[in-house]
């Protein structure tokens, strides 16, 4: 088994990590930063930009720059939270043929897992550049409160990116792993409060020593998969729009370019207000009307921001209360509170958490990196590099089937430790019923229609019998990734039917395979482009050095030699303008061949006359002493 990397696939930022020589290393990307913006841009020429490069061009390309796509993963288009998002993002969210929420870019419909795969590819490449070897296996984190279809969609994204996803792990659990690995032995209970860019999770985790093993057991988890830093940004954007409307009478909501600039400004202002009590947003030329250009200038204080988002922060308290209740633990019994996710840097969030749990949160856990670090530890456990660690996670939501009267009958209750398997016997509702439909549901409501539908399948050819006589055994099996497998068996005939709940990831097996092939083709194109660029650069360098050599040689070069070299130079320059790598390499070789005698002649002459060779070197040394420029600041005395 090769190296297994840990990836935190975040709503706002993503991060990749590896366990190396017993220590967890967060890997810097090509831009030199430890986290990468989860932003993907599709340029008009077909180029795909990921991360900082995508973020930089967002203002000029708002319709084709995608961010916070994780909020759409595994969701239906008609869901209220999706409809709300449609109003707030400059890109187009559309309805897929199967009813899922997809996005449209340059007239092409794309599934969220396909887009998330671009971020995962960037994380994979970051790790490969650092390790100097191919990476094919990963542990990827998801919010603890992600349902089955969202987990399956994340796994699909990994496959499209060329990764074998060895495990899907919950973000708070990963953070607890990162926190607890080096802690003193002994039992203690921690709360992981994870408020990220798009989701909120809270988990109660017990870290214990059992027979010399470091055991991390999740006692309960709760959360909200549509509450995060993006919502805080939206409140600020709305405030700026309202202020501008009051002042100018113009509504910026219909202007994608202005909204993209406002988004960037809101995010920046929010971050600044975590360390300052006031900041100013200044966006010149935000729009224009008949009277000329308009500028947006708004001063905002920390207290104003807090008043705008106070209800969002309060919304995190109910899941905390429910998690404690489900775990059967009083808040006074919590030993440590760990904050994860960039939004937890906000002083109001820290204040509320301290007040609720009655203790200060720990400051020794990096909220942006802890999740990826925990994923890397889990990867090392799966690879066998880390021993004596046992991770016991839970299923976040109740799983069951629809029974007579539209009722949801639970088979696996929420917060059940996984992996787990549970069976229950059901029967028919009508006399001589020859088939039953198994409708699999996930959620906490008693009414089946109020819960998330994960899929349906039929068990047919049941022998005729009075209602209530046939015995249909339904089995639910959740694997370590939290992904559900369902089976139904007629106990009289032994006939059975089973499915892995995966259709709701939004992609069929054929679609996933096609996307994997597309990704491989793109990868091959990228490699060819790099090789072509390298050949062009080599050719350019040779053209430059040869022209310089001919100029330096002067009349020492015969007319015949000069003609041959000039012809080879022209041929190489023409080849460089083309797209044929082999042609460029052939012309490079040709030019090297015809210019070699001149180079040898020059070298021999320098060897015979070292003083002549020293003179240009002295001139170069003098030239090196030249100061490019000196600036003196002139004070403007007005």
UniProtKB/Swiss-Prot annotation:
Pfam name, any one: HSP70
Reported induction: By stress conditions e.g. heat shock.
Statement: the UniProt record of this protein carries the keyword Cell membrane: no
Keywords: ATP-binding, Chaperone, Nucleotide-binding, Phosphoprotein, Stress response
Location of the region described as Disordered in the Swiss-Prot/TrEMBL record: 605-625
Domain of life per record: Bacteria
Disulfide bonds: none
Modified residues (Phosphothreonine): 199
GO molecular function: ATP binding; ATP-dependent protein folding chaperone; unfolded protein binding
InterPro entries per UniProt: ATPase_NBD, Chaperone_DnaK, Heat_shock_70_CS, HSP70_C_sf, HSP70_peptide-bd_sf, Hsp_70_fam
Gene3D superfamilies given in the database record: 1.20.1270.10, 3.30.420.40, Actin, Chain A, domain 4 (3.90.640.10), Substrate Binding Domain Of DNAk, Chain A, domain 1 (2.60.34.10)
Record HAMAP family: DnaK
Family to which the UniProt record says this protein belongs: Belongs to the heat shock protein 70 family.
Protein's UniProt name: Chaperone protein DnaK
């Amino acid at each position: 088994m090769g190296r297994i990397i840990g990836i935190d696939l975040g709503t706002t930022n993503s991060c990749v990590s590896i366990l190396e020589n017993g220590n967890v290393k967060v890997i810097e990307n090509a831009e030199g930063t430890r986290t990468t913006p989860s932003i993907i841009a599709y340029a008009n020429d077909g180029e795909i930009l990921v991360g900082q490069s995508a973020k930089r061009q967002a203002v000029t390309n708002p319709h084709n720059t995608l961010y916070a796509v994780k909020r759409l993963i595994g969701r239906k288009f008609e869901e209220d939270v999706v409809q709300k998002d449609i109003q707030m993002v400059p890109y187009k969210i559309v309805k897929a043929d199967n009813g899922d929420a997809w996005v449209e870019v340059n007239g092409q419909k794309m599934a969220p897992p396909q887009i998330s795969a671009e971020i995962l590819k960037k994380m994979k490449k970051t790790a490969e550049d650092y390790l100097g070897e191919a990476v094919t296996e990963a542990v990827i984190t998801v919010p603890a409160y992600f349902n089955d279809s969202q987990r399956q969609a994340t796994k699909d994204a990994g496959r499209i990116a060329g990764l074998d996803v060895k495990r899907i792990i919950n973000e708070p659990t990963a953070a607890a792993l990162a926190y607890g690995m080096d802690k003193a032995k002994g039992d203690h209970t921690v709360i992981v409060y994870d408020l990220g860019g798009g989701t909120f999770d809270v988990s109660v985790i017990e870290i214990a020593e059992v027979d010399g093993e470091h055991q991390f057991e999740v006692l309960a988890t709760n959360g909200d998969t549509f509450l995060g830093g993006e919502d805080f940004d939206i409140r600020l954007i709305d405030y700026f729009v309202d202020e501008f409307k009051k002042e100018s009478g113009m509504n910026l909501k219909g202007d994608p370019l202005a909204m993209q600039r406002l988004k960037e400004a809101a995010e920046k202002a929010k971050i600044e207000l975590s360390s300052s009590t006031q900041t100013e947003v200044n966006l010149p030329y935000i729009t224009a009307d008949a009277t000329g250009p308009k500028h947006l200038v708004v001063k905002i204080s920390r207290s104003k921001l807090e008043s705008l988002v106070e209800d969002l922060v309060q919304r995190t308290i109910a899941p905390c209360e429910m998690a404690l209740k489900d775990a059967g633990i009083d808040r006074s019994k919590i030993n440590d509170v760990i904050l994860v996710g960039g939004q937890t840097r906000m002083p109001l969030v820290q204040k509320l958490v301290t007040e609720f749990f009655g203790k200060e949160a720990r400051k020794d856990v990096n909220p942006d990196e802890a999740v990826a670090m925990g994923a890397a530890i889990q990867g090392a456990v799966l690879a066998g590099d880390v021993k004596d660690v046992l991770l016991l996670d839970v299923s976040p939501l109740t799983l069951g089937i629809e029974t007579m009267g539209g009722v949801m009958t639970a088979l696996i209750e929420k917060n059940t430790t996984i992996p787990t398997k549970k069976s229950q016997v059901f029967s028919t509702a009508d006399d001589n019923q020859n088939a039953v439909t198994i409708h699999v549901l996930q959620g906490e409501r008693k009414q089946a229609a109020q819960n998330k539908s994960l899929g349906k399948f039929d068990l047919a050819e049941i022998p005729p019998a009075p209602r209530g006589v046939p015995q249909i055994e339904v089995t639910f099996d959740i694997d370590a990734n939290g992904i559900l497998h369902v089976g139904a068996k007629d106990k009289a005939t032994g006939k059975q039917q089973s499915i892995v709940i995966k259709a709701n990831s939004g992609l069929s097996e054929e679609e996933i395979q096609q996307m994997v092939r597309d990704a491989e083709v793109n990868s091959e194109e990228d490699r060819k482009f790099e090789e072509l660029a390298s050949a062009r650069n080599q050719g350019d360098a040779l053209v430059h050095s040869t022209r310089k050599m001919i100029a330096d040689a002067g009349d020492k070069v015969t007319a015949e030699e000069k003609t041959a070299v000039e012809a080879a130079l022209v041929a190489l320059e023409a080849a460089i303008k083309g797209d044929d790598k082999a042609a460029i390499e052939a012309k490079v070789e040709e030019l090297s061949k015809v210019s070699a005698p001149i180079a040898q002649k020059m070298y021999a002459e320098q060897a015979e006359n070292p003083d002549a060779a020293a003179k240009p070197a002295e001139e170069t040394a003098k030239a090196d002493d030249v100061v490019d420029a000196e600036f003196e600041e002139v004070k403007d005395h007005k």
